[in-house]
Amino acid sequence: YSCIYCQLGRTDHMTKQREMFFPVKDIIAELDRVLKDDIRFDVVTIVGEGEPTLYLGLGELITDIQTRIEMPVAVITNGALLYDTQVRSELFDADIVLPTFDAFDQASFKKINRPHRSLDYEMVKQGLINFSREYQGQLWLELMLMSEINDDLESLQKYAAALNEIKY
């Protein structure tokens, strides 16, 4: 995605290809360094400068983090890859998943999310619906309402209809 509201600006390289951006062991080593500082925290959140589900080591990372802490592990995601059964399976081990759901049809999806050209709204929505029915953890939906873009009564009614299909 290259969402119109992203605080990081436009996405330079649009992809939906999953990659091993960093070795899992390097991320875990950094976590271990932080844990040695005995800092109090409530949750470990996996998020990045980009979409976490593009990371091919996500499932292993979640599992490795959970072996080191007793706190919940959360993943913040735009939800674009939830149509992929492998991605959904990897997220099942997270305690909390926070997918973005801020479009209600193809036109709003293109306007707000500016997705990869091969993604369409129905595919992404169905992936979220499927995930919501399979996932046993906490599902926290992120809905971004923007003045004069998607906050009018008609848009809100369309959101409500779409949200009724999701188990949360």
Segments the model singles out, each with a brief description of its role:
Residues D26-E49:
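Short Fe-S-cluster ligation motifs
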Residues T53-Y168:
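Conserved AdoMet/S-adenosylmethionine-binding subsite of the radical SAM
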